[in-house]
Design a protein with these regions (language model features):
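Active-site-proximal alpha-helix that buttresses catalytic centers in soluble enzyme cores
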Residues: 3, 7-80, 85, 89, ...
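Residues that scaffold the ATP/ADP-binding catalytic core of kinase and kinase-like folds
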Residues: 16, 116, 145
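Active-site catalytic microenvironments for nucleophilic, acid-base chemistry
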Residues: 40, 65, 69, 96, ...
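Glycine-rich phosphate-binding loop signature in dinucleotide/nucleotide-binding domains
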Residues: 44-46, 97-102
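Conserved ATP-dependent adenylate/AMP-binding module captured primarily in the ANL superfamily
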Residues: 90-94
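A glycine-rich beta-strand to alpha-helix segment
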Residues: 102-119
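Domain-level recognition of soluble alpha/beta enzyme cores
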Residues: 123-154, 158
Length: 163
């Protein structure tokens, strides 16, 4: 059994219209939400063995803040395929993960991330900023992941929930 954690990046700023979309920073609320989520995941024992993030600044910063506050010690892998990604892009990223990893966190963007979750768990999903979906997959090899419904949604962790 594998566990997949799908995390939408935290609240990002649109204050500077000159910034490229990939370079948008987190708002103060986004930083706090990411810290809080990391602490909650640590306390619950839901810490990934691997984090893979989009290369966009807001996703990278979300991943690093969550990682720091859940005491994740490894390097965060960056994958440009997770920026403006389709559900199929997510499938390919996950399928490339080593089977040595049992719990993987993907940090990305909507609409692709929510669409991926919807297809995997056969639900209507719309992840808000800094929401994390925890899902179980009924196999032991990441390469077995297909785009069709096969996952069981365990929990959605909402950024606004308190410790």
């Amino acid at each position: 059994m594998k566990t997949l954690l799908l995390l939408r990046h935290a609240k990002a700023s649109r204050d500077d219209p000159e910034l490229d979309d990939r370079d948008r920073p987190l708002k103060p609320r986004g930083k706090e939400d990411a810290k809080r989520l990391g602490r909650r995941l640590r306390v619950a024992g839901v810490v990934p063995t691997l984090i893979v993030s989009s290369t966009a600044l807001r996703a990278r910063k979300t991943a690093s803040k969550v990682a720091k506050h859940m005491n994740y010690a490894r390097a965060i892998e960056l994958n440009p395929r997770l920026y403006l990604s389709s559900p199929n892009d997510h499938v390919e990223v996950v399928r490339s993960v080593s089977d040595a990893e049992d719990r993987v966190m993907i940090v990305g963007h909507n609409p692709g991330l929510s669409q991926f979750l919807s297809e995997l768990a056969d639900i209507e999903a719309e992840l808000a900023t800094c929401d994390l979906a925890q899902i179980e997959l009924p196999f032991n090899h990441w390469a077995e992941l297909g785009k069709s419904a096969c996952a069981k949604l365990i929990q959605v962790w909402h950024a606004g929930d308190r410790d």
